[in-house]
């Protein structure tokens, strides 16, 4: 857990990181508005998602039903279409899901890792590339994931 928190502290563009373990339990590391990173986890598969104090945050959480998991079920790494964040009402999430295979899977005991990017940081990064041209961030299917200010106007 500490390693994920340290990485997130160094990468402010990450809103959350989720880990689906090889026993199908789930850990979610989520950045709050005050930049504090909170950890949620499941003690049983598809059971309640609880915070560090044991308080139930989501009573019946099934990671395999989340948009980032459904979009990547074909065992490929993938960008996922924007979807409603379950732990940040009114906010859209954009995730990249990474399937862990081979020696890394054996070492980490993790099946999937998903990272939610912060829209503001992504858009600011695209703005830095060029303020005079439209800059689009596309996924392989040519779907627009994000765009700079000029392209948003």
Residue ranges of predicted features:
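Beta-sheet entry/capping signal
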Residues: 16, 77, 94, 134-135
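Solvent-exposed, extracytoplasmic
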Residues: 2-9, 13, 104, 110-153
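A short acidic (Asp/Glu
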Residues: 29-30, 90, 149
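Hydrophobic beta-strand positions in blades of beta-propellers and related beta-sheet-rich domains
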Residues: 26, 95-97, 144
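Extracytoplasmic/periplasmic sensory segments of membrane signal-transduction proteins
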Residues: 1-76, 126
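Extracytoplasmic/periplasmic ligand-binding sensor regions of membrane-associated signaling proteins
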Residues: 43-120
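Hydrophobic beta-strand positions
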Residues: 19-21, 49, 99-100, 137-139
